[in-house]
Amino acid sequence: MTTEKKSLGIQEIMDLLPHRYPFLMVDRVDDYEISDERKTLRAIKNVSFNEPIFQGHFPAKPVFPGVLILEAMAQATGILAFTMVGKPSPNELYYFASIDNARFKRPVGPGDQLVLDVEFLKERRGIAKFTGVATVNGEVVCTAELMCAKREV
């Protein structure tokens, strides 16, 4: 059995997510799988010194904030959710509902490429649960469990 590699470019990502510069934290999707056995997605966030956050965090020793790693992971889960169920209607948004068991293993800085691997676990009453792992050069930098909720606006 062969598996077709599926990817998404920035325009396709912008069609799915409401986020825009400077808060769009996913540059591309390298692969995703939506099957009965698994629902996974691999996304990329390129961390650049030109990002506004580095003006104050921290100018002499820039560190990409852990909360933004989690945001990138959450945006990757949103993309996975939308590839599973389709883009929300104009009066719907998916809200980041919770983070559990977030662990930060090492700092991330300019020049690093975050690889974001997320997996859908379950959905109940409009609330979806995911796991996420962020790596740089194959080394784990962050893990977390994430939940999002679909709501009308």
Swiss-Prot record:
Top-rank taxon, per record: Bacteria
Descriptive protein name: 3-hydroxyacyl-[acyl-carrier-protein] dehydratase FabZ
InterPro entries assigned: FabA_FabZ, FabZ, HotDog_dom_sf
Entry-linked PANTHER family: 3-HYDROXYACYL-[ACYL-CARRIER-PROTEIN] DEHYDRATASE
Location in or out of the cell: Cytoplasm
Record's GO cellular component terms: cytoplasm; membrane
Sorted UniProt keywords: Cytoplasm, Lipid A biosynthesis, Lipid biosynthesis, Lipid metabolism, Lyase
UniProt lineage: Bacteria, Pseudomonadati, Pseudomonadota, Gammaproteobacteria, Aeromonadales
Species annotation: Aeromonas salmonicida (strain A449)
GO BP terms in the entry: fatty acid biosynthetic process; lipid A biosynthetic process
